[in-house]
């Protein structure tokens, strides 16, 4: 691996905000950073399986197949189903690539449905309930299955692609030193497209901060995919995203391609992934995948 590539990755994966800022300072424009993302190697990935019913195969990316979260998935949450754990960790972990690797492997079982889930699921409805809900669907006319919003899933089912207004940019510049740095980076890479939840967008104040471009269904830690739909895709997620916005971009693709999405009633809750950290650090590290997200939409890769 080139020494510069390794050094840049150390800065990007650092837990020190100043290091992450130095990482962004290295690049003059979005194209340079995107090239770094494309050249970034993948962490090793290894498959571990738990045998079970193969009509629904569950694919779970995890840092430790023998850890507390993974064991809970195998022994409780998805007990009785064929489970494919994709173990991958370290500084070059890439969520999108781990998911793609596991989904491709799951095809060997020729399942009707493939569940893609995070490993930090805390509780879920009985698998028999999930199966009964899926039986009700028109299989041939259902590409994607999402879960109905509930108390255990309080986030928005609908997402909104927005164009940020100058008022929001100005607000960030006066909202404290961290937000000023954050907005400075967004200005540097011309990041004015983003995705927010519909409930947040519907707030009165948001009307002055964002211009709505398109509303679409989003998914977060759990999605069910028809195997016939998966056969039409070379890769489920775009592997160039680095642990962020790959789900938003795919959700946007579903909308653009008019994919058939069904919503079922099934309870599930999770801790919530923090691959990029939380708070200010998370916002800083999400800039990289947001740069790629903006690039794809602005350069004719996808229609707005």
Residue positions per predicted region:
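Short beta-strand-to-loop acidic/aromatic patch adjacent to the donor-nucleotide binding site
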Residues: 111-122
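Short, acidic/glycine-rich phosphate-metal binding loop used to engage nucleotide
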Residues: 64, 88-95, 151
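A conserved hydrophobic helix/loop-capping motif in glycosyltransferases and polysaccharide synthases
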Residues: 51-52, 56-66, 147
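Conserved catalytic core of nucleotide-sugar-dependent glycosyltransferases
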Residues: 130-233
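Glycine-rich, basic loop-to-helix element that forms the pyrophosphate-binding segment
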Residues: 90-106
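C-terminal catalytic/acceptor-binding lobe
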Residues: 2-51, 212, 217-219, 239-304
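Acidic donor-diphosphate engagement hotspot in glycosyltransferases and nucleotidyltransferases
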Residues: 99, 125-129
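Short, acidic, metal-binding catalytic loop of nucleotide-sugar glycosyltransferases
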Residues: 48-53, 72-85
């Amino acid at each position: 691996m080139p020494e510069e590539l390794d050094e840049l990755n150390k800065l990007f994966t650092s837990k020190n905000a100043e290091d992450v800022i130095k990482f962004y300072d290295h690049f003059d424009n979005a194209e340079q950073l995107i090239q770094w993302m494309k050249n970034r190697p993948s962490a090793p990935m290894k498959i571990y399986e738990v045998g079970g019913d193969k009509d629904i195969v569950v694919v779970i990316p995890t840092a430790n197949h023998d850890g507390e979260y993974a064991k809970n998935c195998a022994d409780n949450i998805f007990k009785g189903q064929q489970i494919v754990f994709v173990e991958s960790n370290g500084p070059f972990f890439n969520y999108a690539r781990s998911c793609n690797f596991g989904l491709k492997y799951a095809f060997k079982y020729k399942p009707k449905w493939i569940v893609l889930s995070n490993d930090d699921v805390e509780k879920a409805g009985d698998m028999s309930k999930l199966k009964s809900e899926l039986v009700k669907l028109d299989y041939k006319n259902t590409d994607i299955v999402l879960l109905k919003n509930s108390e255990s899933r309080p986030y928005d089912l609908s997402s909104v692609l927005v164009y940020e207004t100058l008022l929001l940019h100005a607000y960030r510049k006066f909202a404290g030193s961290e937000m000023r740095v954050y907005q400075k980076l967004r200005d540097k890479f011309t990041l004015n497209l983003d995705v927010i939840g519909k409930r947040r967008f519907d707030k009165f104040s948001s009307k002055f901060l964002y211009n709505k471009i398109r509303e679409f269904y989003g998914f977060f830690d759990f999605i069910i995919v028809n195997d016939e739909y998966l056969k039409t895709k070379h890769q489920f997620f775009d592997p160039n995203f680095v642990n962020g916005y790959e789900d938003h971009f795919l959700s946007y693709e579903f909308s653009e391609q008019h994919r058939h999405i069904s919503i079922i009633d099934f309870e599930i809750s999770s801790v919530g992934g923090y691959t990029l950290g939380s708070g200010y650090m998370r916002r800083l590290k999400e800039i990289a995948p947001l740069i790629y997200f903006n690039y794809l939409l602005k350069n004719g890769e996808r229609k707005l």
